[in-house]
């Protein structure tokens, strides 16, 4: 999956990455539908044609931002456990995914915020929602596997566990501010403690 990386350069100081960052901030502030190319041009101090040099449409900007957020989350699920991990059972993999997801949210806070506000109003948004649902199913399957192994209590439905856990993780976008008291590592520890300690079999 691609990340929000610069692929073309135009005027100094206004590369693709910089334009996309401003666009995502505007989408989050005003809503995607209410944000026009003209508004972005004014914020950037560029002409509309200069923006179109980098992006063919506003939809392309949205697609790039959502792909960055989703790609980061999908990569966490696909990533192997670190070398030297004590176990590769399902609950260890689930913990690895939860920690990784927290880091993705912190590292890509604006893009993930945008993803969580998608409602399926455009083809781009509908594709993103399809990928997000597929991600949710993978998390549910991992929870169910950990329950089958006996690592997690099984009296709570796996889908409910997945939704509640990621509801907590996703809430980070509403209150987290970079440079605060807790960094990504500490937040990940907190999430794992709250989400898994009450679910583990003694």
Q: Model segments located where?
A:
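Amphipathic alpha-helical packing segments from all-alpha helical-bundle domains
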Residues: 71-78, 103, 107, 124-149, ...
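Hydrophobic alpha-helical segments that form the core
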Residues: 93, 97, 102, 154-174, ...
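Short hydrophobic/aromatic patch on the recognition helix
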Residues: 44-55
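Basic, helix-initiating cap at the start of DNA-binding domains
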Residues: 1-30, 34-43, 59-63, 68, ...
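Amphipathic C-terminal alpha-helical segment
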Residues: 103-107, 114, 136, 141, ...
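Hydrophobic alpha-helical connector segments
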Residues: 64, 75-107, 162-165
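Generic detection of well-ordered alpha-helical segments
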Residues: 13, 17, 21, 25, ...
């Amino acid at each position: 999956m691609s990340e929000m990386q610069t692929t073309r350069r135009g005027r100094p100081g206004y590369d693709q990455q910089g334009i996309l960052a401003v666009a995502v901030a505007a989408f989050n502030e005003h809503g995607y539908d209410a944000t026009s190319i003209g508004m972005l041009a004014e914020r950037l101090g560029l002409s509309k044609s200069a923006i179109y040099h980098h992006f063919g449409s506003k939809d392309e900007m949205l697609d790039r931002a959502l792909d960055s957020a989703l790609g980061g989350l999908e990569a966490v699920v696909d990533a192997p456990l670190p070398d030297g991990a004590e176990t590769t059972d399902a609950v260890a993999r689930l913990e690895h995914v939860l920690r990784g997801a927290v880091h993705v949210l912190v590292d890509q806070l604006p893009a993930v915020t945008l993803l969580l506000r998608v409602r399926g109003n455009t083809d781009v948004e509908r594709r993103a929602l399809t990928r997000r649902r597929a991600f949710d199913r993978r998390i549910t399957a991992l929870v169910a596997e950990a329950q089958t192994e006996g690592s997690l209590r099984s009296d709570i439905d796996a889908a409910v566990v997945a939704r509640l856990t990621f509801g907590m993780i996703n809430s980070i976008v509403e209150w987290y501010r970079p440079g605060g008291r807790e960094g990504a590592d500490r937040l990940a520890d907190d999430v794992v403690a709250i989400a898994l300690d009450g679910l583990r079999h003694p």
